[in-house]
Amino acid sequence: VKRILIPVVCACILIACTPSEEVENEEQRVENETEPVETLTASKEDIRFVAGWLNETAILFVDHKDDEDRLLSFDLKTGDIHTLFTSTATISEVQVHPSASQLLVKTADDSTEAIIHILDHAGTLLNEVSIESSELEIQWNDIDASQLLITAFTDDWSYEIMRYDANDDTLVAVMLPDPFPSWLGAEELVYMEDLDVVKRLLSTGEKTTLANNANQFHSATDQVLIESFEGEQIRYAVLNAIGEEKYSWFVEDHSFVMEQAVFLDENTLMMTITDQTEMKPTSFLVKIQDGEEVKRQKLPEGGSLDCKGDKCLIGYSLDTWINIETGERVKWLEIEPLE
């Protein structure tokens, strides 16, 4: 009876049922509907790894077919698969630039050389550079896609750090005590020196200490998240590019440490935290907004994290995505068992 009377009342008393309310109700109805998602089924022998989000509806993965490695995109809404890049050499790494419509693909035939290919989203080659090592740590500048920071390791794990400029196709050596630096903004690097987090201006070599007694850090674009220990607590702080603290928070349980972190915007980040002291580690996906924990969801396992829009790919194989707000989990990749 109620459902019949409501539209009658709304029709008679227009002020009680405005067009804006109707729009809001329609938006809520759409939001509550589960969006259709296609599933990719692949052989364990063929698929090599999932690279992450290409955009909010498509995921990149690498497979092997007809003696070639292939970089493919899979559209979750349509199920369409597109080939973006193929190579007779092994594809071992793929990165998606956060602001430019570009992809980075690393290939190698053996341990003596690797080639870094820069492509657009259609798969067109834009640049490539050869490095005399296949063990590389590659940091792509989030602001300027023409700049790469490359650490090349040798067999004895000594290393050389180089800055690659795609504008003039040059490699310039960078001397640092840490083989795993990251970009902070367009022209600065951040790295660990003993227990200090240090930033350095590339043009002058000027150094600034950002934090002491640090455990680890994660930088993106022009901000850096630093994890440090203060007594029995873990302190997290987000700093801007000039070293000013934007916000911070404490975690009482120091057994949980940051495993992965992704900045969604200037004020929001997603973290996976894991209790490594347990025989079977417990992991959570945590949403932090302006230094406040606003959402915590238990994960079946730790592993990698890649977020785009309202979804995060999770797990060691990135075969599942989770809705950040609702906690809905969908396994988009099914691996067929070996016969």
Model-assigned labels for residue ranges:
Residues 18-20:
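Bacterial signal peptide processing site
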Residues 37-72, 88-94:
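Beta-strand-rich domains and repeat architectures in extracellular enzymes and scaffolds
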Residues 45-52, 90-96, 134-141, 175-187, ...:
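Repeated scaffold domains used in trafficking and secretory/extracellular systems
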Residues 26-38, 67-83, 111-128, 156-174, ...:
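Surface-exposed loop/turn elements that mediate protein-protein interactions on large endomembrane-trafficking
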Residues 13-16:
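C-terminal motif of bacterial Sec signal peptides marking the signal peptidase cleavage site
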Residues 124-141, 145-147, 152, 177-178:
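Asp-box/WD-like beta-propeller blade repeats and closely related beta-sheet repeat scaffolds
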Residues 82-107, 114, 125-134:
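Blade-loop segments of beta-propeller domains
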Residues 55, 60-66, 104-111, 149-155, ...:
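Beta-strand C-termini and the immediately following turn/loop, strongest in propeller blades
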